[in-house]
Curated annotation (Swiss-Prot):
Residues 447-457, 495-510 have a biased composition (Polar residues). The keyword Cytoplasm applies. One of its GO terms (cellular component) is apical plasma membrane. Expressed in the germline and specifically in the gonads. Interacts (via SH3 domain) with wsp-1. Interacts with cdc-42 and (via SH3 domain) with wve-1. CDD domains: F-BAR_CIP4-like (cd07653), HR1_CIP4-like (cd11619), SH3_CIP4-like (cd11911). Residues 343-366, 447-519 are annotated as: Disordered. Residues 527-589 form the SH3 domain. Residues 359-436 form the REM-1 domain. This is Transducer of Cdc42-dependent actin assembly protein 1 homolog. The gene is toca-1. Plays a role in protein trafficking, actin organization and embryonic morphogenesis. Potentially acts as a cdc-42 effector. May play a role in hypodermal P-cell nuclear positioning. Together with toca-2, is required for protein trafficking regulating yolk protein clathrin-mediated endocytosis by oocytes during oogenesis and retrograde recycling and the sorting of recycling endosome cargo proteins such as mig-14. Also, together with toca-2, controls the distribution of actin at cell junctions. Belongs to the FNBP1 family. Disruption phenotype: Defective endocytosis by occytes characterized by either reduced or non-detectable yolk protein in the oocytes and by an accumulation of aggregated yolk in the pseudocoelomatic space. This is more pronounced in the double knockout with toca-2 where nearly 100% of animals display this phenotype. Double knockout mutants with toca-2 also produce 20% fewer eggs compared to wild-type animals and there is some embryonic lethality whereby the dying embryos display defective morphogenesis including failed epidermal enclosure with extruding gut cells and increased width of the intestinal lumen.
Amino acid sequence: MNDSCSWDQLWDQQGTLNEYTGKGIDLLERIMAYSKERASIELEYSSKLKALSKKTAMKMKSESELWNSVSYVKGFHDVIAGIVPVATQHELIAENLKSAVIPFTTQKIAEYRVAKKQLESDNSNLGKQLRMVIDEMAKSHKEYVKCYKETEAAMLKYAKAEKNMDISRLELEKTKNNYQQKCGMLEESKQTYAVMTTKANEEQSAHYDRKLPQLLDNYKKLHTNRILDTVEILSKCVEAESCVNQIIASCHNDMRRDIGLIDPSRDANLVVENMKSGHPVPQPFVFEDLGHPQDRSSFMGGGASGPAGSMDGMDATMKKGGTLMSKNGKGVARKQSMHQKFFGGGTADKKTDSGDYGTLPPQQRARKIAGKISDLEKEKDRATQSREGVSKMQAAYRENPKLGNPSDCDAQLAQYGHEIDALSNQIQKFKILLDDVNAQLGAGGLSATSVGGSDTPPSIRSVSSASSGVTSRVNTINDAHRTNGGVGGGRRESFSGSNGGSDTDPTINGNGHGRDELYEECSNPNPVLGEAIAQFAFDGAQDGTIRMEANEKLWLIEKDEGDGWTRVRKENNSADGFVPSSYLKVTWFGKV
């Protein structure tokens, strides 16, 4: 583009120039409106980001300790936390727009509107002044033309009168005087017209050569300054955002660093460490040889030797859940719950949980106790430091009584002493618990009495302990079978009485003859007390339990005695055992 272009060439385009200048100022107003809306959007965006981060963090707090400690979840936590400083920077963008861009733009818009109005007024005044001089020249020219025509008419009249011989001399003189008068007026109007023409030319020359170029130069200055201010305003808009880009980039780098700390191997170890129970795997199943049915034909007829009959009674008693033999040699027909079969003990051994993580599996309990010990030791250290601080303050009071009364510190020292003693007792208690748990974990599993003695409810003790306990009973029975020569060596006598279900205690003599046994026949299973439908599947992996499928129909042969287990039998009488009571939908027959 040619740089020599002059605004003087726009001498006849003032109207278009005014319209163009007004549009430039309107653009500044549009920039200001953009800045206001952008600031509002940035504030809303910042607020929504912070709300999102807070809402997500609140959801994370409700998760488990393991879930929040694995590195990939922690990485997500850190990224969410990193959103807050990013949101703060967007809030700063809005503040920069409000403080640096909008006020400056408002000021410039007002200045340029005033300047434009002044230029329009100056342009109007210059035009009016030029038109006024030109109008005066046109008026004098019109007067001059009028005088010229009147003089011409008077001259023709005088020439005609001079040739007319009939006109009087007086009339001729009168016509001549009129002609001469008109010639004077013509000369006077001519002089006036000449003066006004000169004045109009001078004014027009000044208008187009000096006044209008100066006005156009003012338009040019306004145009240039407005564009420069537009550039500055746009730069401020960009600077309002770019000044925080470095901080936002730093936040993003921190997020990348946190993401880089995600360690799958460490997470896998944490999962194992937090989920492992410490229970040993189930022990192998013990094969129980029942012999051949032909070997039982002798006791089916009513005769049997003492040892074999005793063994059969023992077997029947095991099926019923009673104890094998009392000290005086008498069998005790006493039912045993699933809870007692698995974990031993009765209701007298049940105690409430002391709050020492007794409901957790051994391995997790040991980890929790160790963490509790660490927390208590930290509390003890803080209490010890506080007591030392009070002791130093008391010593300072003793050296300088003006600072305070030393006896005022005695109450605090006593309080800290009690706290330290209580924390020490707690630490010692948990250390003993931890030693017990670690010792039993090192022994390969928990015994029937869980860590912490009977403080831990038997219902939550290790199932592996129950498995080993029941397995040992089965081994004892097998040993008895082998010692007495197998099941076929004797017979089982039925108990006397018309009901067949008497609960009187039977006595067993040495040779097995003349006994009133309570034990049931092997071929006579427990009576059916009701029916049940399995609501859920159960694997029956532990000893004494039975596998069942969802919606499977089962016979109820023993009620839940408060331990959460119910004894059932398959519908085809193929097997019986215990299942969780909560897994069943039961229907009892009559009064049970």
